[in-house]
């Protein structure tokens, strides 16, 4: 994604009142180190530096980097990096959290990047509401990949009126909490295969008819359109047993 396309997709929240309402749902303290995805004009960055130990803002737009630095001139616990988040290398040897009001058009790429390429223990993102709902939909491959690594929660609605320019849809503040991976390293490839066959409804490629019926019964599934992640893991574990 080049700089021009990302700039044209940005929607800013600048009202102190609205920012404060969002920040009340984010667990931060003076010991936290934060990576901010897209500092924009620095309005959220300012709130973060006042609450946290250190903030690293990653912003692809050079002009917005300067705007953010000027807004934070009275603070020294931050740095603004003029980089593309999709190319950024997160540290592997320190504790940190991530916050971002991320562009709608690259939300999937960003969320994959930060879940699979960072070690952040808590991630807070403002995303399009429909996208947030898809992250909780076990009929979606992205949701099934993410749920193996993080617990996903929708914390609050963020009305479209908060933004400028005003988008056509509302947004949500979501939280991703890191957990011990539910899939062992040796099973990752097998899990990826199972997920893709499942979401494409290619059941015959992963189960015989009897295996499928027994697996559904063992998982307590009555409706294929309404299964929990735990039930999905039960299906995957059955698949592994049948394919030792």
UniProtKB/Swiss-Prot annotation:
Effect noted on mutating residue 108 to A: Decreases affinity for S-adenosyl-L-methionine 8-fold. Reduces activity by 99%
Effect of residue 112 to D: Decreases affinity for S-adenosyl-L-methionine 5-fold. Decreases affinity for RNA 6-fold. Reduces activity by 99%
Xref: InterPro entries: KsgA/Erm (IPR001737), rRNA_Ade_diMease-like_C (IPR023165), rRNA_Ade_Mease_Trfase_CS (IPR020596), rRNA_Ade_methylase_Trfase_N (IPR020598), SAM-dependent_MTases_sf (IPR029063)
Effect of residue 133 to A: Reduces activity by about 80%
GO BP terms, alphabetized: response to antibiotic
EC number: 2.1.1.184
Stated consequence of mutating residue 101 to A: Decreases affinity for S-adenosyl-L-methionine 4-fold. Reduces activity by 90%
Effect on the protein of changing residue 140 to A: Decreases affinity for S-adenosyl-L-methionine 7-fold. Reduces activity by about 85%
A cellular-component GO term for this protein: cytosol
GO molecular function per UniProt: 23S rRNA (adenine(2085)-N(6))-dimethyltransferase activity; RNA binding; rRNA (adenine-N6,N6-)-dimethyltransferase activity
Recorded catalytic activity of this chain's protein: adenosine(2085) in 23S rRNA + 2 S-adenosyl-L-methionine = N(6)-dimethyladenosine(2085) in 23S rRNA + 2 S-adenosyl-L-homocysteine + 2 H(+)
Functional summary from the UniProt entry: This protein produces a dimethylation of the adenine residue at position 2085 in 23S rRNA, resulting in reduced affinity between ribosomes and macrolide-lincosamide-streptogramin B antibiotics.
Protein name as annotated: rRNA adenine N-6-methyltransferase
Organism: Bacillus subtilis
């Amino acid at each position: 994604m080049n700089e021009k396309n990302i700039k044209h997709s940005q929607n800013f929240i600048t009202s102190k009142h609205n920012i404060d309402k969002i920040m009340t749902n984010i667990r931060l303290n003076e010991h936290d180190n934060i990576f901010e995805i897209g500092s924009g004009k620095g309005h959220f960055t300012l709130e973060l530096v006042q609450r946290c130990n250190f903030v690293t803002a990653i912003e692809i737009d050079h002009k917005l980097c300067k705007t953010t630095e000027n807004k934070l001139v009275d603070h020294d616990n931050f740095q603004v990096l003029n980089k593309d988040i999709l190319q950024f290398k997160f540290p592997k040897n320190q504790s940190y959290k991530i916050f971002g009001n991320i562009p709608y058009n690259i939300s999937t790429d960003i969320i994959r990047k930060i879940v699979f390429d960072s070690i952040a223990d808590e991630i807070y993102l403002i995303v399009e509401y429909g996208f947030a709902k898809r992250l909780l939909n076990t009929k979606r491959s992205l949701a099934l990949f993410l749920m193996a690594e993080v617990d996903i929660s929708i914390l609050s609605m963020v009305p479209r009126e908060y933004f400028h320019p005003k988008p056509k849809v509302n947004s949500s503040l979501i939280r991703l909490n890191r957990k011990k991976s539910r899939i062992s390293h040796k099973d990752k490839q097998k899990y990826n295969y199972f997920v893709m066959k499942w979401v494409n409804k290619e059941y015959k490629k992963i189960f015989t008819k009897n295996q499928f019926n027994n697996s559904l019964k063992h998982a307590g599934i009555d409706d294929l359109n309404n299964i929990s992640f735990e039930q999905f893991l039960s299906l995957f574990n059955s698949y592994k047993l049948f394919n030792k």
